[in-house]
């Protein structure tokens, strides 16, 4: 699966901004069929960042969210800034 097909869009809200600042986490809507391995590879390819942990959930509307924790040597704020959301 192509990295641009896996990662759909970042989620920007007060909660996600707090996660970026305090927990070094990013939140994206992802392709519903994407596995955690697909998401990990897409983050590595698109942002050159190593992933420490991924949690996923499917919303009642059927969209899949990925909560991505980056390793401590990478800054989620810098990745968010490169996306123009921070």
From Swiss-Prot:
SUPFAM superfamilies: Ribosomal proteins S24e, L23 and L15e (SSF54189)
GO biological process, any: translation
Top-level taxon of origin: Archaea
GO MF entries: rRNA binding; structural constituent of ribosome
Quaternary assembly: Part of the 50S ribosomal subunit. Contacts protein L29.
Role of this protein: Binds to 23S rRNA. One of the proteins that surrounds the polypeptide exit tunnel on the outside of the ribosome.
Protein name from the UniProt record: Large ribosomal subunit protein uL23
Organism: Methanococcus maripaludis (strain C7 / ATCC BAA-1331)
Gene, per the UniProt record: rpl23
């Amino acid at each position: 699966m192509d990295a641009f097909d896996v990662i759909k869009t970042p989620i920007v809200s007060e909660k996600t901004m707090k996660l970026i600042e305090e927990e070094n986490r990013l939140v994206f809507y992802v392709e519903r069929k994407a596995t955690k391995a697909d998401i990990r590879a897409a983050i590595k390819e698109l942002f050159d960042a190593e992933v420490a942990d991924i949690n996923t959930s499917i919303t009642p509307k059927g969209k899949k969210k990925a909560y991505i924790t980056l390793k401590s040597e990478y800054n989620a704020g810098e990745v968010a800034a490169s996306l123009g959301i921070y």
